[in-house]
Amino acid sequence: MKTDLVIAGYIIHQNKVLLIHHRKLNLWLPVGGHIDENETPNQALLREIKEEIGIDVEILNKSNIPAEGNIKCNLATPFYVNVHSVGDHDHCCLFYVCKAINPEQLKINNELKNFEWFAKDDLNKDHVPADVKNQSLAALKLYNNLLD
């Protein structure tokens, strides 16, 4: 089965996680998408976030090892990676924790129905898929640990 490499970012602001309501999939999900040719996962994530919701973020969990010698750049470490089915093919998804820089400028594009900032307790709503809930809780915990 064909497997695409994709990224997703759990964007945190004021101890809430942003989820988008995807129009085509009719699911509440983190912002994300495919990694294009000649693009790093970090570049893909920043691009997808800008295209889908129009804001800037800081990707957290970056390496503190100096980028010296033959190293072009350090990439953030995903907090979770999985392979899941999307019908006729699979996605290998790298999940990241992000800090919203300008959340007041958030505006969804036409791929999305809606967005919502979810507090920890709000993630128990029926419309939040179990995997997204679990990943959101892990992202919130990691975010708070990284900023302590």
Predicted regions and their residues:
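Conserved Nudix-box catalytic region and its N-terminal flanking loop in Nudix hydrolases
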Residues: 16-58, 64-65
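Compositionally biased, intrinsically disordered linkers/stalks adjacent to structured regions
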Residues: 137-148
